[in-house]
């Protein structure tokens, strides 16, 4: 079975990026991958997926990756990710050196002035198969900063469960002591 690693240093911060990554993880798992998270708390992932109503069947942890976020050793990250067929990495603007067969970086924010054009960054990008972003605006900034052609994948939207329509007359307005500001007194007469 193919193995995928989801790397997001922010699973303890509930936000749009976490939902995006967990939804992506669900899609990756449904494609037949054995799913691993670079995290140290399986219960936290379970709580998030339950809260966000995201279905993950069999989540595993790879705790060896988490300390590498801040270690600053590109070679250590490369070696640790080599055993995976796919790595999906939520970036903070930096580009890690990833070793999987297929490497995808998600940029949630339009990072600029972070040295995306530097030689070392461009060298690490040679190992990245695709950069994905969540909007055309983010794409325009990321493409210019990192000299790349990112792919826009919009965040998933949970369908609204509709109820039976209720017949209702709704009036929206405000109460003000001075009714003649907009000549409303004429409407009353």
Task: Label the model's feature ranges.
Residues 7-22, 178-182:
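A short, glycine/small-residue-rich beta-strand->loop->alpha-helix junction that serves as a flexible
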Residues 17-28, 187:
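Short amphipathic alpha-helix
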Residues 78, 111-133, 137-141, 145:
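Membrane-proximal helix-turn-helix segments that form the acceptor-binding/catalytic region
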Residues 86-115, 132:
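Active-site proximal beta-strand in glycosyltransferases
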């Amino acid at each position: 079975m193919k193995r995928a690693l989801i790397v997001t240093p922010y699973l303890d911060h509930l936000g749009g990026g976490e939902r995006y990554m967990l939804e992506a993880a669900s899609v990756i798992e449904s494609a037949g991958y054995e799913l691993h998270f670079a995290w140290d708390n399986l219960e936290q992932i379970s709580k998030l997926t339950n809260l966000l109503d995201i279905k993950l069947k069999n989540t595993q942890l790879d705790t060896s990756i988490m300390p590498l976020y801040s270690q600053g050793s590109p070679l250590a990250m490369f070696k640790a990710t080599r055993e995976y067929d796919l790595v999906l990495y939520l970036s903070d603007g930096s580009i890690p050196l990833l070793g999987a067969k297929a490497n995808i970086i998600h940029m949630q924010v339009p990072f600029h002035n972070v040295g995306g054009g530097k030689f070392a960054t461009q060298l690490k990008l040679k190992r990245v198969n695709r950069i994905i972003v969540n909007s055309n605006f983010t794409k325009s900034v990321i493409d210019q900063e990192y000299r790349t052609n990112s792919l826009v994948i919009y965040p998933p939207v949970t369908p609204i469960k509709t109820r039976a329509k209720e017949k209702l007359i709704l009036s929206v307005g405000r109460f003000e002591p001075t009714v003649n500001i907009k000549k409303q007194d004429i409407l009353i007469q």
